[in-house]
Amino acid sequence: GNVSAGTSDFAMVVVDHKLNVHEEIDMVTTPAGKPVAMVHCNNCTSDLNAWVNLFKEYQELLGIPVNMDEIYSKLYNIALTGDTDCGGLLSYNYISGEPVTGFADGRPLFVRSANDKFNLANFMRTHLYASVGVLKIGNDILFNEEKIKVDRITGHGGLFRTKGVGQRILAAAINSPISVMETAGEGGAWGIALLGSYLVNNKKGQSLADFLDESVF
């Protein structure tokens, strides 16, 4: 399977048996025609990105040169040092409505009690987990109710641009091993390029699946 995670996110898992009907799950196919269960979520990193931009404005206010890749790297990595329970902090990252959880409109919300452990590491960890929270709900249906087994899940998209962080957050959220390639941050454009390469470079009669296994992965 694979997970694309950026401003929105989705998981696509190739399945080998017929599933029950779930409002949270869409059935699609691979380019080769294999059945795929898809969990699509409207909200992923948009709310987190808004907070990162706030930190960028503060850095600009101090007169410090801004490098967005460095800001993301520092903030994402500090999240790994946070408490496992995020210090009790909660984030609801719904910039827009979320059909998976039945919300028609978005109202992003950050919540803490007076005694929660409110620091930067826990703050960032909270928002990273919130980014994949709805995705976890859909994947729990696939893994726990439908008993889907996955060989591997490949992550791609902006969440994985900072090496190791998004990968670990997602692995913990959906309790599955996540592999990430060097091209993870390229997103859909890289997949389109692969399809183009297949059309040009496949051996006579070679299926797309065989081409990907033998020449790409």
Predicted regions and their residues:
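Active-site core segments that coordinate phosphate-bearing ligands/cofactors
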Residues: 1-154, 159-217
